[in-house]
């Protein structure tokens, strides 16, 4: 809320402003989403991490961990072993919260849905990368010696307060960035 009181000689009237509170209490009002028993039909399905829509466009486009899962993880896999030298992981850092200007800044230091601590695991469950204090949207992991595996799993160990949300996991034989 506020009030605009311009100088009297410029021809603009005094008026009150009302600005709604952003994400009041961190809650989405009047909305409950439950995980479907059939995750293939869930709007937050694991398959979303293979999409290249790394923001909510016509749907969530993210895998969201079940808050009841004590060991949440999402896996991308292939029929045959792949040689991977780079992995790009795209986390939810609140793309749907508009920032009218970069001068406005963000009202929180850490976005609740962003994954804070995670591991990448190969097809035998070995940790091939670990990040312990992530704040970033895009995590680029480069291996000097390529990893050969039939799958890469992202294991979420902690977030900044809300269930983990992941927009993408993309693995490359040759680095793309």
Question: Model-predicted segments: where are they?
Answer:
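Trp- and acidic/polar-enriched beta-sheet ligand-binding modules for extracellular glycan
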Residues: 67-71, 93-177
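Hydrophobic beta-strand segments within beta-rich accessory/binding domains
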Residues: 85-89, 154
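Disordered, acidic Ser/Thr/Pro-rich linker "stalks" and the adjacent N-terminal cap
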Residues: 1-81, 90-114, 171-177
């Amino acid at each position: 809320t506020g009030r605009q009181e311009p100088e009297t000689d410029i021809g603009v009237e005094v008026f009150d402003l009302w600005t709604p509170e952003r994400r009041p209490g961190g809650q989405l009002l009047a909305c409950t989403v439950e995980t479907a028993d059939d995750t293939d039909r869930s709007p937050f399905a694991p398959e979303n991490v293979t999409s290249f829509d790394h923001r909510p466009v016509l749907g969530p486009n993210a895998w969201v961990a079940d808050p009841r899962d004590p060991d949440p993880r999402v896996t991308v896999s292939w029929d045959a072993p792949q040689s991977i030298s780079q992995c790009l992981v795209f986390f939810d850092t609140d793309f749907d919260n508009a920032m009218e200007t970069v001068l406005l800044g963000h009202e929180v230091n850490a976005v609740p849905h962003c994954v804070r601590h995670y591991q990448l695991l190969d097809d035998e469950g070995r940790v091939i990368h670990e990040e312990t204090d992530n704040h970033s949207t895009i995590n680029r992991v480069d291996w000097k010696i390529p990893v050969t595996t039939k799958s890469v799993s992202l294991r979420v160990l902690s977030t900044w307060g809300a269930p983990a949300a992941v927009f993408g996991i993309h693995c490359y034989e040759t680095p793309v960035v």
